[in-house]
């Protein structure tokens, strides 16, 4: 239990080097503004979203891989996640972040062809099932991302089949809003702000799944005037630590 707690604390705190020898945090951050052969699908700030998330994580770990635009083909994203999952040990943390277009079963990669060649929920479940890391998290800022959630699951720590915490930017029938003034998606802006400390509602230097959900959900709903509602689901406790602050 102690080693698991320390593993999670690595997410956003600078821990002594002796811990880094046995605990690692692996991050794959993907941002797609442009889509091959689909100029009408272009977005504005998805690359910036992924850069913002990756920049935050780079202050805590060197194991951060970024894939932007034409780099983020379906094969490249899948292979990188597969590599990360194979490297992670039981006490490690694996984080996948995505910003871009969503599709009913997953996320659109750069080489998307209508609803094909995306990274699907089935792909992620298959990869994570073979991953030794006990703590796996998916953050996604994409339209209709709530469709990734199996039907009947509630927001919060719902579901008993997924070993992964999914935190998605919107419900299945909602778009995910970009903020021109911040040059970020509204979800990513408040996600990074929350993980950096703003979500620590009881000021105990630990941010739990429940705290990050409530903080981001409230801020996104306010900023979007109730047009966007983040969802969270997976097999985890409400008090699971997702960030530890100095």
Label each region the model flagged:
Residues 3, 10, 15-246:
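Cysteine endopeptidase catalytic domains of the caspase/legumain-like
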């Amino acid at each position: 239990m102690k080693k698991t707690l320390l593993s999670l604390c690595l997410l956003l705190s600078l821990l002594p080097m002796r811990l880094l020898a046995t605990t690692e945090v692996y991050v794959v951050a993907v941002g797609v503004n442009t889509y091959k052969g689909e100029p009408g699908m272009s977005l504005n700030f998805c690359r910036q979203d992924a850069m913002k998330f990756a920049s935050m994580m780079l202050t805590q770990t060197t194991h951060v891989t970024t894939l932007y635009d034409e780099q983020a083909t379906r094969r490249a994203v899948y292979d990188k996640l597969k590599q990360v999952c194979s490297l992670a040990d039981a006490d490690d943390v694996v984080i996948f972040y995505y910003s871009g277009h969503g599709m009913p079963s997953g996320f659109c990669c750069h080489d998307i062809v209508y609803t094909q060649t995306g990274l699907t929920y089935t792909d992620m479940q298959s990869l994570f099932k073979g991953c030794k890391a006990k703590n796996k998290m998916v953050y996604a800022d994409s339209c209709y991302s709530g469709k990734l959630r199996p039907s009947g699951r509630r927001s919060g720590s719902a579901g008993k089949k997924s070993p992964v915490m999914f935190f998605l930017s919107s419900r299945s029938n909602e778009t995910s809003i970009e903020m021109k003034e911040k040059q970020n998606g509204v979800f990513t802006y408040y996600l990074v702000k929350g993980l950096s400390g703003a979500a620590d509602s009881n000021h105990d230097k630990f941010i739990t799944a429940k705290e990050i959900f409530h903080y981001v959900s409230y801020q996104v709903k306010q900023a979007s005037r109730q047009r966007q509602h983040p969802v969270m689901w997976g097999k985890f406790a409400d008090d699971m630590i997702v960030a530890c602050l100095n």
